[in-house]
Amino acid sequence: MSSTRRKSPGSPIVLIIDDDADTRRMYGEYLRMKSCTVFVAGDGRSGLDKAVDLNPDLIVLDLAMPRVDGWTVLKHLRESSWTIDIPVIVLTAVVTVRDEAFHAGCDAYLTKPCPPEVLWLQTVALLRDREGLRERAGRGPRV
């Protein structure tokens, strides 16, 4: 398994898995502006592959995608020891499945259209929570 690590402690790696190119571009540009290192995947299959390869700090995941949908991606992320602790923000146009998404293992649920600022605030909160948990577990910050 190869794994890409952060370029610097202040540059979290975010993987956006969404079949809509405009969505990937808009949120990707905003997160890059906020000093994130952003990778994208246009479907669930390539998203799963990148999640294992990159070991990102956070994943932004759409639910309705071709090849492998977001539900299947989330299930695999939560079942794999490589990806189980990566925070996942579900960002979807589907407004009626919030409870199911949390039950499936997402850490946050946002509906499209979502202002990029809201995604950023949720990203910061989840990354802060994750680092706090790692430090309390004696594993220290991830580098």
Residue ranges and their predicted role:
Residues I89-L91:
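Hydrophobic/aromatic residues positioned on beta-strands within the core alpha/beta folds
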Residues S35-G42, K50:
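Short hydrophobic/Thr-rich beta-strand motif most characteristic of the beta2 strand and flanking loop
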Residues R25-M33:
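Charged docking surfaces used in two-component/phosphorelay signaling
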Residues C114-A125:
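C-terminal output helix
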Residues L54-V60:
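Active-site beta3 strand of CheY-like receiver
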